[in-house]
């Protein structure tokens, strides 16, 4: 009961903070969100917002001055991804980065093997990922609502696995990579139109600080031992 109450308070506090901080940049928001977030709170917020990437990144948030240091590092990395990988959506979210690839770029219809264009773009992305090795990378597969729930879940997992496997061939360490398939369960766009369904067929990369980056950021922020 006490844990649930603390989680509720954490979720409420973060939700209020996010609603009132629209004028803040991503680095400032990273500093404002405290460790009250946590993985559980992040998952709740992500589900409520219909945004699995948001929830996962909030779950990895450190907050405070350390969070601001991490945010600056992520600002730099996000800009490099935008420059190196044109045509994909790159968004700074709190202390992380979300890179969104349309499935039309990566795969043929109803397939999970990568296209030649996909391999070229993933090669470009890997150059930035290997330059900044102190991050974790969660690869999320998503589909539209065409087909059965079970089939879409399997397809999203196969696609996420294909992307992860190719990144490993490009010298992105396996220890940094995790994958999740969401099937049709987490649409970011409407499934009522062809355009919306096409946008929901996507693969997202969630880039967050690993423990080494967090520890270095704590030292830089003078918060070692906190």
Features from the language model and the residues they span:
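Bacterial N-terminal signal peptides that target proteins for export
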Residues: 1-9
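C-terminal motif of bacterial Sec signal peptides marking the signal peptidase cleavage site
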Residues: 16-20
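Short, low-complexity, glycine-enriched hydrophobic/amphipathic alpha-helices that associate
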Residues: 22-79
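Structured segments of extracytoplasmic/periplasmic soluble domains
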Residues: 47, 68, 72, 84-88, ...
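Amphipathic, membrane-active segments
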Residues: 74-101
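Periplasmic peptidoglycan-binding/anchoring modules of Gram-negative envelope and division proteins
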Residues: 83-84, 107-141, 168, 205, ...
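Periplasmic OmpA-like peptidoglycan-binding domain that tethers envelope proteins to the cell wall
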Residues: 142-216
């Amino acid at each position: 009961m006490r844990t649930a109450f603390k989680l509720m308070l954490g979720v409420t506090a973060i939700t209020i903070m996010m609603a009132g901080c629209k004028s803040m940049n991503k680095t400032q928001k990273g500093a404002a969100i405290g460790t009250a977030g946590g993985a559980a709170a992040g998952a709740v917020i992500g589900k409520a917002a219909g945004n699995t990437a948001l929830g996962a990144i909030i779950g990895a948030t450190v907050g405070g001055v350390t969070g601001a240091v991490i945010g600056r590092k992520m600002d730099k990395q996000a800009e490099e991804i935008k420059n190196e990988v044109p045509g994909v959506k790159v968004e700074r979210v709190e202390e992380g980065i979300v890179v969104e690839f349309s499935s039309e770029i990566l795969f043929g219809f109803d397939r999970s093997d990568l296209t030649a264009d996909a391999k070229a773009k993933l090669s470009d992305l890997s150059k930035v990922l290997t330059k900044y090795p102190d991050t974790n990378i969660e690869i999320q597969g998503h589909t539209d609502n065409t087909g059965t729930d079970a089939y879409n879940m399997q397809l999203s997992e196969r696609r996420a696995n294909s992307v992860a496997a190719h990144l490993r061939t490009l010298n992105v360490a396996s220890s940094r990579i995790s994958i999740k398939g969401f099937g049709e369960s987490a649409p970011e766009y409407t499934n009522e139109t062809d355009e919306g369904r096409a946008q929901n067929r996507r693969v997202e990369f969630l880039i967050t600080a690993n423990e080494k980056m967090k520890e270095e950021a704590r030292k830089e922020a003078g918060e070692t031992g906190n």
